[in-house]
């Protein structure tokens, strides 16, 4: 029986999350979510269950409202890196969820790395 796209996505998400939990060592998690029209990123402290910084194309100040392209993803990556630096965060691990690491997700990760985040 062939797996649907959604089933494959859920399998990837569980596999990625389990690997990250095994190597977390108390670091923060940079979680990324991509929809058909927007992309968002959050720095999450799983130990306390708190979001420390967030950025999204839904923010009007970013100027990419309703856009989900590589340029908008890079802008979100730069923004989350700036907000992480302002909060005193330098290291985290990248949680791509079930999304493949290319295109928009890769652009966000590269921009966050250029902004000073280490993962």
From Swiss-Prot:
Q: Which GO terms describe its molecular function?
A: 5S rRNA binding; structural constituent of ribosome
Any Pfam family matching the protein: Ribosomal_L18p
Q: How does it assemble?
A: Part of the 50S ribosomal subunit; part of the 5S rRNA/L5/L18/L25 subcomplex. Contacts the 5S and 23S rRNAs.
NCBIfam families, per database record: L18_bact
What family does the database annotate? Answer: Belongs to the universal ribosomal protein uL18 family.
Q: What does this protein do?
A: This is one of the proteins that bind and probably mediate the attachment of the 5S RNA into the large ribosomal subunit, where it forms part of the central protuberance.
- What is the protein name stated in its UniProt record? Large ribosomal subunit protein uL18
Source organism: Cereibacter sphaeroides (strain ATCC 17025 / ATH 2.4.3) (Rhodobacter sphaeroides)
Taxonomy of origin reads: Bacteria, Pseudomonadati, Pseudomonadota, Alphaproteobacteria, Rhodobacterales
